[in-house]
Amino acid sequence: MIRAAPPPLFLLLLLLLLLVSWASRGEAAPDQDEIQRLPGLAKQPSFRQYSGYLKGSGSKHLHYWFVESQKDPENSPVVLWLNGGPGCSSLDGLLTEHGPFLVQPDGVTLEYNPYSWNLIANVLYLESPAGVGFSYSDDKFYATNDTEVAQSNFEALQDFFRLFPEYKNNKLFLTGESYAGIYIPTLAVLVMQDPSMNLQGLAVGNGLSSYEQNDNSLVYFAYYHGLLGNRLWSSLQTHCCSQNKCNFYDNKDLECVTNLQEVARIVGNSGLNIYNLYAPCAGGVPSHFRYEKDTVVVQDLGNIFTRLPLKRMWHQALLRSGDKVRMDPPCTNTTAASTYLNNPYVRKALNIPEQLPQWDMCNFLVNLQYRRLYRSMNSQYLKLLSSQKYQILLYNGDVDMACNFMGDEWFVDSLNQKMEVQRRPWLVKYGDSGEQIAGFVKEFSHIAFLTIKGAGHMVPTDKPLAAFTMFSRFLNKQPY
């Protein structure tokens, strides 16, 4: 009887390698979440993208859309992006700011973005908290707060690396905008305690870092941009200020409160675009609210002058009214994004369950029921800075009034970190125009504050090249 010769050693090793490779693929990116064909594109992308759900805390399911880097995804950093609100969708960031494709006014077509942040990074867009966009909770309970959202986002991030283990060793950056000024540092404090995540830094654009500094600075911003007359300014100085210090935040003087109500009206409800002072207001001068069929449309996200009594009374009255209410960001046209994301073919491509309600840019109930536990992010940033491990960037478009540059600059100054680079212009090369001043930057030990000249609240929308240049220098630890 002739016995078969044992297989050569190299064949056994090859088989073992194939088995290991197969096993690792089984634990890698979830095939069921991969977007096979995205409607609206003339040509499908060469990079891979995924849409599905990550497990938040409790019974929460947070929708994510993950776009791999167009340049070496295996070695590119992972960047989490969160929009704010509270209660607004991060798909706004993807489809109108810095995603690989931008939705067009027809609500059908997508065009590739030459300044997409996924040119150099793997970007994870997360709709948070539950109740926002396509995110949901099995118990349908959507009242939440800063601490719960941080924990839920943290658990979702852990779930992401479970689903995509091939990225667990990549550099991780946490980024966001607006109320992500609260979301990002509170999340970062949790992430820094998890050694399995390779956290490198965080960047927040036009963030709400301190309610007090945001309100106090906004009055100065409004006056010196010609929005308040001398009579109102003089009255504010008389009734809100003493001993060369003004309190426009929680002043109890009745005349001061009356004057601040007028400032709030001018800034937020007179027809000026609160997100970009020099941009038109989409749809024309708005009223405080409007009716669309049987729905009341509200446009105040509740982040400025929150201590004014009329602001709180107005929202509570709406909640008790029993009317159907929708929230839209002021002076912003959300029709294109809403039309696109409510297209049944798009929802199917994104693996969205059929039973979920329509997608809205912002969720009124999430916003109104949200409990704001922190009035300042001072302690969170000091904890992050004390580790001396992370690079932090706070950047602001300088014509935004929702979260103005002056308030965030005051906030960074108040952290009392060692100054390393004095305030100076930073430059961007604009084709044939050569290098131009893109804004100003000052750098402290492990934290920088930077402005983008002529940009509003959504910096990548208004100044895409400057935003991309800033983002690239931030990721690569290059001088701004």
Swiss-Prot record:
Changing residue 395 to C: In GSL; loss of activity. PROSITE patterns: CARBOXYPEPT_SER_HIS, CARBOXYPEPT_SER_SER. One of its GO terms (biological process) is regulation of protein stability. The keyword Protease applies. Residues 1-28 form the signal peptide. Disulfide bonds join 88-362, 240-256, 241-246, 281-331. The active site is at 178, 400, 457. Changing residue 178 to A: Inactivates the enzyme. Its EC number is 3.4.16.5. Glycans are attached at residues 145, 333. It comes from the Eukaryota. Changing residue 249 to N: In GSL; small amount of activity. Coiled coil: none annotated. GO terms for cellular component: azurophil granule lumen; endoplasmic reticulum; extracellular exosome; extracellular region; intracellular membrane-bounded organelle; lysosomal lumen; lysosome; membrane. It catalyses: Release of a C-terminal amino acid with broad specificity. It is found in: Lysosome. Keywords: Carboxypeptidase, Disease variant, Disulfide bond, Glycoprotein, Hydrolase, Lysosome, Protease, Signal, Zymogen. Heterodimer of a 32 kDa chain and a 20 kDa chain; disulfide-linked. It is linked to Galactosialidosis: A lysosomal storage disease associated with a combined deficiency of beta-galactosidase and neuraminidase, secondary to a defect in cathepsin A. All patients have clinical manifestations typical of a lysosomal disorder, such as coarse facies, cherry red spots, vertebral changes, foam cells in the bone marrow, and vacuolated lymphocytes. Three phenotypic subtypes are recognized. The early infantile form is associated with fetal hydrops, edema, ascites, visceromegaly, skeletal dysplasia, and early death. Belongs to the peptidase S10 family. This is Lysosomal protective protein. It comes from Homo sapiens.
